[in-house]
Amino acid sequence: MYMSNPKNLLTVCLLTSTLITHAQCMRVHYDDGWTEQIAVGHVDSITFSQNEQHLAPTIMLNNGLQMPAFGIGTYSLKNQTCFNSVYTALKNGYRLIDTAYMYGNEEELGRAVRQAVADGICQREDITVITKIYPGTQFANPEKAIQERLDLLDIGYIDIMLLHHPGENDVKAYKAMEKFVEAGKIRSLGISCFYIDELKRFLPQVSIKPVLVQNEIHPYYQDTEVVDYIHSQGIVVQAWYPLGGRGHQSELLSDPVLQCIAEAHGKSLVQVILRWHYQRRVVAIPRLKQSCPHS
């Protein structure tokens, strides 16, 4: 789904929680790093850990670093539209931005991050930027591909770098990324579109455990077995197409069961879907479309 206003999306995420005072809460830590506050006496009520800026809640990764539990994807955003979109998203509280070599927008995204930091909107260390390298020539010559991502983004370091898909030389490419972690140029590593068989093959061959696996997840493609397996490895699950994948989006967003749930709780259907992800301990990154001019 496209979201035309990044502030609205973050707002609907936050409004889905049950608001209770800190004194009424106890904090629950899961082995996979996810943290929730549970209302004492009301175990079905969960509140986010929020600050006064209304930023998204954060989760602990398996390397001790933190990442927002909600973010935005930038697939299909190009040129000035990408700059405007990312800058506006940061201005409105987003701190998790996803891109990739294949999106062709890393340079504009990096420029927006630098501008937001220069304008005092946020600090660089508060932003999590994810990018990816792609199978084929980039896996065959990963050092070059990784350095190109660093140069195009030009934001000092990359927070999380992923392998976009499994493929020939994926272990070689990941091991190259590990060297960049050791050099301080990348902070965390991850993988995308990996399922149980690929994970069982891949994980024993690498030294640095991925902090996240980014897969297609939504109510019409729940993939519970895969999600549970990834969580069992102490790895965060991140959902692309969280509001419905190709061929499912319009159907999901008009689903009568979800509509009934939304009406019963006085929420929008999108709020219900995002809450579903959050309560499954899945990080949602809906795709953003925003073309308002930067000012």
Go through each PLM region and give its residues.
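Short, acidic/polar
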Residues: K78-L90, Q138-L152, D197-L199
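N-terminal binding-site loop/beta-alpha segment at the start of enzyme catalytic domains
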Residues: E52-I127, L243-G244
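Acidic-and-aromatic substrate-binding clefts and catalytic sites of carbohydrate-active enzymes
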Residues: Y75-T81, A100-E108, P135-A140, P166-D170, ...
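Residue-level recognition of alpha-helix boundary/capping or hinge positions
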Residues: M1-M3, K7-T11, H22-E52, I59
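Beta/alpha (TIM)-barrel catalytic core signal, keyed to glycine-rich beta->alpha loops juxtaposed to Asp/Glu
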Residues: P57, H165-S295
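CE4/NodB-like, metal-dependent polysaccharide N-deacetylase domain
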Residues: P142-L162, K179-A183
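N-terminal signal peptide c-region/cleavage motif recognized by signal peptidases
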Residues: T18-I20
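A short, structured active-site edge motif that brings together acidic residues
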Residues: Q123-T137, D159-P166
